[in-house]
């Protein structure tokens, strides 16, 4: 960041924090002057969009921090009093304090272990704090909620400043560099869960939401589908407007991920998600932040092939990407839950598994925010998936619940797992906790997950073998259906390990969801009606009118000889009618436009 910050937040000991005081007019003025200097320095040499807008990365990874000077303390305490409606007794109950007023609260009473604060990091609650809803949990929730508001207010204010400085400025700050929903495990300072960052809300105050992602899932495994999830988040945060997709290619220490998912495949994944531009990061540096220039020739050849293919294909994708399935983004988990609280990344893997399952069936999958659902976006979708969200009750979700209820009544379908508070509140789904057991389906299922429940209503589609209770239920509401799974279906589908058949079942043949001849979702949802060929697990399809982008995430070539195409643009050479492994192709198909 620029060395002149105007005004910095202060530590409790009176020392500067080492970053911007984002709400300070002085700090904001230094940012304006910095951008003014760049505009003057580069002049006509600056890159512009086709409409003449100047593309400007107005900020790199903003991280709001509190300030413990007089003004900063007053600001936070005023916010805290407003949040609690002036009810100090409610705050005392949560924080286990005996304060008589908000104004007398001390920093160590209202901020979580403030001695651990620095310009990038902070203290975080433990898993026990989350499980027991301790005072430290509530301090954390309040701290992060406040900082999220600071960031959004900052972006809104700076948008006005940028417009005054240069009306043709295209405002595209880089909001996060280490992935958004999937962060590198073990790198606690770079996780979204302590950044107070909700990019869907930030999107209201910028021209384009941008963050850098990588093909790395929550278990620290190279995974192209995790990158596809991040791309879907970018697309939907930007409301399907043209957007730039970030890709962190200078990554090596996380298992040398680009030896498993090559750059061309990553670029194809972003293009399939609708990206109109690429922000490639990590060419050179002193640590894992930039080692791309040291990569071998195979890596560079793949990058070159991906870039050339994208340059040819992106201009052809002028029609909107098809919308079919919506996954509800677990905003509360993303905002509040540190990685170390999410054991083995299983909450995030549950969303990934749902995304994989529907993508493997050829569906086009979007990831939508509760505010977007409340605003009416579900009218464009056939199915809604609700992944695990253990912090759902922390959100303001009344409008979301009404929208979901209306969606189902109008004919939409909902898929969800256990402990789904949204399904309980909006759809009156009732469940009871039961001991782990296997499920009688067309085949017998060993459920992967961390808890199992039985449902008390609806039609039983699958039953627990021992108790006979309902494991998979179908509930009809109006013209729509709710499909309830008594185990974490997405997490189960994302597994790459084989569970052991419970000993009391002897040598009976049982399998996890991912190894079934036909999964429950495949039986209930079927394949996308727009799919021009039989689905292939690990192959992603994206329709843009009469253009079809296919990305092969598998290690073997895929037979596409059955597709009738007027024109094709392949990333890498392959035998006629075949799509190479870990590569993409764009086809102009001989079918009417699909919008």
Residue ranges and their predicted role:
Residues 167-169, 238-241, 409-413, 480:
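A short helix->loop->beta-strand "cap" motif at the edges of active sites that frequently abuts
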Residues 58-59, 211, 280, 367, ...:
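Conserved beta-strand positions
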Residues 377-384:
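Short acidic/histidine-rich motifs immediately flanking catalytic phosphotransfer sites
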Residues 197-198, 356-377:
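A short, well-structured beta->alpha microelement
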Residues 4, 8-226:
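Polysaccharide-binding and catalytic clefts of secreted carbohydrate-active enzymes
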Residues 388-595:
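A conserved amphipathic helix/loop scaffold
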Residues 1, 13-49, 54-55, 161, ...:
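Mature N-terminal, pre-catalytic/accessory segment of carbohydrate-active enzymes
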């Amino acid at each position: 960041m620029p060395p002149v910050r105007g005004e910095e937040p202060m530590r409790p000991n009176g020392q500067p924090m080492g970053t911007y005081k984002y709400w300070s007019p002085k700090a904001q003025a230094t940012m304006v002057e910095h951008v003014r200097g760049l505009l003057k320095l580069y002049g006509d040499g600056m890159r512009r969009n086709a409409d003449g807008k100047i593309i400007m990365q107005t900020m790199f990874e903003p991280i709001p921090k509190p300030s413990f000077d007089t003004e900063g303390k007053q600001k936070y305490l005023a916010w805290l009093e407003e949040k609690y409606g002036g009810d100090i007794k409610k705050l005392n109950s949560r924080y286990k304090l005996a304060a008589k007023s908000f104004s007398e609260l001390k920093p160590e009473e209202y901020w979580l272990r403030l001695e651990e604060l620095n310009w990038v990091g902070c203290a975080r609650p433990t898993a026990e704090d989350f499980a027991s809803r301790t005072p430290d949990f509530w301090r954390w929730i309040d701290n992060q909620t406040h900082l999220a508001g600071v960031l959004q207010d900052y972006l809104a204010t700076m948008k006005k400043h940028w417009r005054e400085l240069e009306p043709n400025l295209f405002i595209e700050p880089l909001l996060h560099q280490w992935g958004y929903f999937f962060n590198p495990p073990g790198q606690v300072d770079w996780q979204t869960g302590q950044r107070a960052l909700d990019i869907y809300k930030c999107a209201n105050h910028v021209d384009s939401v941008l963050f850098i992602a990588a093909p790395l899932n929550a278990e620290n495994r190279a995974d192209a589908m995790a990158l596809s999830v991040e791309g879907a988040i970018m697309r939907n945060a930007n409301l399907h407007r043209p957007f730039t997709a970030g890709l962190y290619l200078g990554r090596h220490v996380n298992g040398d991920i680009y030896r498993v998912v090559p750059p061309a495949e990553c670029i194809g994944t972003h293009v399939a998600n609708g990206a109109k531009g690429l922000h490639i990061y990590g060419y050179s540096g002193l640590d894992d932040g930039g080692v791309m220039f040291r990569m071998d020739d195979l890596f560079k050849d793949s990058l070159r092939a991906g870039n050339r293919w994208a340059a040819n294909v992106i201009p052809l994708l002028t029609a909107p990407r098809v919308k079919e399935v919506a996954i509800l983004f677990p905003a509360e988990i993303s905002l509040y839950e540190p990685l170390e609280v999410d054991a083995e990344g299983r909450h995030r893997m549950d969303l990934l598994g749902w995304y994989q399952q529907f993508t493997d069936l050829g569906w086009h999958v979007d990831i939508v925010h509760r505010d977007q659902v409340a605003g009416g976006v579900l009218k464009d979708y056939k199915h809604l998936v609700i992944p695990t969200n253990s912090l759902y009750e922390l959100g303001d979700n009344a409008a979301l619940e009404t929208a979901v209820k209306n969606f189902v009544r109008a004919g939409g379908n909902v898929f969800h797992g256990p402990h789904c508070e949204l399904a309980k509140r909006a759809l009156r789904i009732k469940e009871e906790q039961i001991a782990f057991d296997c499920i009688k389906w067309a085949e017998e299922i060993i459920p992967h997950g961390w808890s199992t429940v039985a449902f008390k209503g609806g039609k039983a589609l699958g039953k627990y073998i021992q108790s006979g209770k309902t494991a998979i239920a179908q509930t009809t509401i109006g013209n729509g259906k709710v499909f309830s799974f008594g185990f974490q279906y997405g997490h189960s589908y994302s597994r790459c390990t084989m569970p052991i058949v419970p000993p009391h079942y002897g040598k009976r043949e049982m399998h996890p969801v991912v190894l079934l001849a036909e999964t429950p979702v495949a039986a209930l949802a079927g394949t996308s009606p727009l799919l021009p060929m039989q689905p292939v697990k690990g192959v992603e399809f994206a329709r843009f009118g009469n253009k079809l982008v296919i990305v092969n995430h598998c290690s073997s070539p895929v037979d596409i000889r059955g597709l009738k195409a007027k024109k094709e643009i392949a990333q890498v050479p392959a035998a006629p009618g075949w799509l190479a492994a870990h590569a993409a192709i764009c086809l102009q198909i001989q079918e009417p436009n699909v919008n």
